[in-house]
Amino acid sequence: MSSDDQHIREIRVHPIENGTVIDHINAGQALNVLKILNIPTSSSRVVSVLINAPSVHGRKDVVKIEGRELNVEEVDKIALIAPNATINIIRDFEVSDKDIVHIHSQIEGVVRCINPNCISNSNEPVTSKFAVSSNGQRTILRCSYCERIISDDIGEHLL
């Protein structure tokens, strides 16, 4: 096939009238974002998911949710698995607000410690607590009680 015969193909996702677009999600994390947002498969909302879409910086995921704006707690959880994500609020088909997620230096009650012997996993009324660091691509959590580190599959340990 000659270069003249090649066609540029685009992946097109219909724009949303009102809602949220979460862009620049780390490739492969879109389904964890849906888990964080607790969107059931039986939802009447239109949800569009792009996984491993080409990007200037490699690959990314994108999630579009019609008719819903995220709360602060949801955005904070998304930041743990997608530290470079942007949250775009769409109103009347236009971006009305655009924010970059921010990772807090400490989180409480958001992630379960992976150490089964940690005090936060006992029957005691102790809330999980982690120190958070990030290098831009990877988030690292250190339990404040047992100092166990979580850096892989953080989405699997969200409460």
Swiss-Prot record:
<comment type="similarity">
    <text>Belongs to the PyrI family.</text>
</comment>
<keyword id="KW-0862">Zinc</keyword>
<dbReference type="InterPro" id="IPR036793">
    <property type="entry name" value="Asp_carbatrfase_reg_N_sf"/>
</dbReference>
<dbReference type="GO" id="GO:0006221">
    <property type="term" value="P:pyrimidine nucleotide biosynthetic process"/>
</dbReference>
<dbReference type="InterPro" id="IPR020545">
    <property type="entry name" value="Asp_carbamoyltransf_reg_N"/>
</dbReference>
<dbReference type="Pfam" id="PF01948">
    <property type="entry name" value="PyrI"/>
</dbReference>
<keyword id="KW-0479">Metal-binding</keyword>
<dbReference type="InterPro" id="IPR002801">
    <property type="entry name" value="Asp_carbamoylTrfase_reg"/>
</dbReference>
<dbReference type="InterPro" id="IPR036792">
    <property type="entry name" value="Asp_carbatrfase_reg_C_sf"/>
</dbReference>
<feature type="binding site">
    <location>
        <position position="118"/>
    </location>
    <ligand>
        <name>Zn(2+)</name>
    </ligand>
</feature>
<dbReference type="GO" id="GO:0046872">
    <property type="term" value="F:metal ion binding"/>
</dbReference>
<dbReference type="InterPro" id="IPR020542">
    <property type="entry name" value="Asp_carbamoyltrfase_reg_C"/>
</dbReference>
<dbReference type="GO" id="GO:0009347">
    <property type="term" value="C:aspartate carbamoyltransferase complex"/>
</dbReference>
<comment type="subunit">
    <text>Contains catalytic and regulatory chains.</text>
</comment>
<feature type="binding site">
    <location>
        <position position="146"/>
    </location>
    <ligand>
        <name>Zn(2+)</name>
    </ligand>
</feature>
<feature type="binding site">
    <location>
        <position position="113"/>
    </location>
    <ligand>
        <name>Zn(2+)</name>
    </ligand>
</feature>
<protein>
    <recommendedName>
        <fullName>Aspartate carbamoyltransferase regulatory chain</fullName>
    </recommendedName>
</protein>
<dbReference type="GO" id="GO:0006207">
    <property type="term" value="P:'de novo' pyrimidine nucleobase biosynthetic process"/>
</dbReference>
<comment type="function">
    <text>Involved in allosteric regulation of aspartate carbamoyltransferase.</text>
</comment>
<feature type="binding site">
    <location>
        <position position="143"/>
    </location>
    <ligand>
        <name>Zn(2+)</name>
    </ligand>
</feature>
<keyword id="KW-0665">Pyrimidine biosynthesis</keyword>
<dbReference type="Pfam" id="PF02748">
    <property type="entry name" value="PyrI_C"/>
</dbReference>
